[in-house]
């Protein structure tokens, strides 16, 4: 498993220029926020302007050491950037150490996470807020005023009374009235794709309890695993090399992802494409209708999606890569577009958490992996699995009953060497 920094109390949508700080409650927990990290975790904060003109993140400053239960619900005041101006938009980042050293003495913290760290030396994942708008109170400071500067002079006899009243009112508003953000951003630096570009993978999550709108461990592990082995598959067993040979073949490749949620794995795979040959990839991320808006937003955020790719600068990449999001409901027969363009590879991560959905999942997988007798297609299944309940493994026997064999080819260690994610290959002909 991995550890994620997130906001139990998120930052506000906006803050006044006269504010000295804003309140958040950070937490360090697992992917579904059901288990807190009961080890001292130093958390650092940074600010980055994102509008009207973006800036580099500011130097990280220590915020707190997260240690439940004392830290679980504790609100913390974070000073605003001294560079903040009215009509700016700034995002807040929370990060921990680069290394697994809990006291951070071995490495300086940085406001970044690397995707390959998740398979090499897992670290605590940082988080970015959405943009926080810097506003002024009605009748307050002028546009362009920098926090702490340009205040109107007050008469000495009124200064103390006004200051106390204003401070009290602002605290009251901050605690009770200010709308809070409902989304967070994760960013992961990818391996060098081209000499002039080192891109990042960007994912928006919602802070609600919607499971299809969060990043899950197995999705991260499979994304990192793909990027690690697409450049070198020789350390994998034959079935693993067979999967990677599909991804590096010269012929066109059709990929369907099941239960894509945020679109993480499809996006990660798509961003690995420039490393490959001149083959064409057509990738379709699927889920229920409720997941489509966020999934499409994440595709666009990463300069993917059919509409966006038609307008990218690099025409070579756009001609070799198609990525889209479509509805695929496991409770219904496969849509016509699947039969019209059947996949050669089906990928899935964290699709086994709901055992009551196994009959529907089994039906969908069987329809994809075991095509009609008149079809020459024999797709392979690449699945990342993290055990959350031992009963989930019943799916393997259910698949075998449908003629689909499953073979484990690798494991990805979690943070602090526990909570493995297993990498499996499935198919009707694995010999």
Residues of each region from the PLM?
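S-adenosylmethionine-dependent methyltransferases
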Residues: 1-431
